[in-house]
């Protein structure tokens, strides 16, 4: 029914695309490869649904980001390893359906150079339950960059209003596992009666020069 959230990077002398699919029940995420950025070959589903499980992410997940070698605007994105592992960011909803219920964020890792065999956390690393009212409706896309040995995770979230708004916040970590929200969140806010009055979302952060 839908293909969403493409994230393109260079790995093993090929272009890879991390992307999410929706089948009416929930999100699952996959990889495709290409030599020319125009013709893509499906490689495999890496984040699957597991309804027989009692895991927090059993409905499946929307993978949004993989940690890169660097975050330079002027370079092709290449995967980077942290402690010998590749890292993937995803969010998962608690119920079947389209974005059904408040999502939470997890980080998966792999040592597999083919990027097909992933280890998923037993619990989310970042939850709306620990946040403020502006994110009480759940979390969405996140991206992670490193600056001065500190990890920064930018994420968008929504409130619980019927006509909800989505805004972008940031959290920091020293180990990718334990995150602390910035007290000044949200760092990107909606502007009433403007083009961005409801959504300021889907962050993608790069560094340009100094």
Labelled PLM ranges:
Residues 1-210:
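Carbohydrate-active catalytic/glycan-binding domains of CAZyme proteins
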């Amino acid at each position: 029914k839908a293909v969403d959230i493409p994230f393109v990077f260079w790995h093993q002398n090929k272009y890879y695309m991390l992307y999410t699919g929706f089948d009416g029940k929930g999100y699952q995420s996959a990889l495709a490869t290409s030599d020319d950025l125009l013709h893509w070959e499906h490689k495999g589903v890496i984040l699957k649904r597991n309804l027989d499980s009692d895991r927090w992410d059993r409905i499946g997940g929307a993978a949004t980001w993989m940690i890169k070698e660097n975050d330079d605007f002027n370079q092709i994105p290449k995967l980077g390893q942290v402690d010998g592992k590749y890292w993937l960011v995803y969010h998962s909803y608690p119920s079947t359906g389209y974005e059904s219920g408040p999502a939470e964020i997890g980080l998966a890792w792999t040592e597999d150079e083919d990027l097909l065999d992933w280890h998923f956390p037993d619990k989310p690393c970042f939850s709306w339950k620990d946040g403020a009212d502006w994110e009480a409706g759940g979390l969405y896309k996140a991206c992670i960059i490193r600056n001065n040995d500190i990890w920064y995770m930018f994420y968008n979230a929504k409130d619980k209003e019927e006509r909800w708004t989505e805004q972008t916040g940031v959290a920091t970590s020293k180990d990718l596992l334990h995150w602390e929200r910035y007290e000044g969140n949200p760092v990107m806010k909606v502007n009433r009666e403007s083009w961005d009055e409801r959504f300021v979302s889907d962050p993608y952060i790069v560094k340009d020069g100094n």
